[in-house]
Amino acid sequence: LWSSTQTPSELKDGIHEAFDIPQSKIKVVGLPSGSSFGQWWSNNFHMLTVCLARKAGRPVKIELDNEECMSTVKRRHLERSVGRMGCTDDGDLTFLEVDHVIDNGAYGFKDDVGFTAHDMWHPIDHANITIRGINTNKVTAGCMRGVGDCTISVAIERMADQLAEKVGMDPLKFRLKNQVKSGDAIAREGLADLPQGSVEAYLASIPESLRDAWPDPLRLSSGSTHELLRRGAKQFNFKKKWNGWGRPYKIDGSKHRAVGVGTGAHTCGVEFEGPTSALVRIHRDGSAKLYCSVGRQGQGSETTQAQVAAEALGFPLEMVEVETGDTDACPWSHGSIASNTMYRTGWATYEAAKDARRQLLELSLIHI
């Protein structure tokens, strides 16, 4: 199957599961997709193509224009957040409650998105985050860039602003007072009603023998928003321009200019079906070839992966070639979804290149 897909390996898995064809008889060649925003994963038209080709016994091609893509493949989830947030008179958060509903359309299945958005805020004694996926008679929804994180983050940020205004605190000070800092424990206790197939259910299913190696409690090792907030506020001169809630710092006719502060969280590096892998091969002329199954949406994944491999090998960049789409050559990978390309495939590439360098040096010692 030749297809403009972000996930060659997962598409191969999907064909195997749908038609019970041995994976040894399936080959997917991933082609450039252009901008996708998550559309070019494993989709219905992929399976229709395989089904028609098997029935006809002939090659089959399905081609969709932009309008057909938008109306038949999938769309962004429609989401609604309703919540409450409370604090003491001096601005210390006391409780957070969010009820988040996701419209999955006819056949969508998301019910676990945005579950880390509340981790931006310091662990609260009383918190309840409920996320529900529902099916409706609309076009099936699917993952499109920042699934759930954006919506829940905006809802929580809006509540934080309203709360800060009520206690007479500016948005910067309120966030510096309440957001998680490096070294703080991230609360993960009290998980309940985990939907089958959800991220949380996956985490809960991990054996205790593996969990023993995890830090307890789980702490934020880096990435505190405090320094970012201070630097950002300084960049646009927040102290000078902040004039109070609802009061602009400049009025020019009908234009009212004001400033605000906000933060957001996004989850990347998700792992469901298995670990991501990469392979580096050293050729007799001293050049190298990297095999990694990633998507090509115009983000330059071939270049970035080649740069990682070249640096780890100690080779010039022009001596490293990259194969990204052929599942017969490339080991299994999640592909380019959920901000995975550099975070996960990049690490796999780095480790594969380091291992190739180690083997090369060991062989050179034998011949010295």
Model-inferred region functions:
Residues 1-365:
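Structural alpha/beta core scaffold segments of enzyme domains
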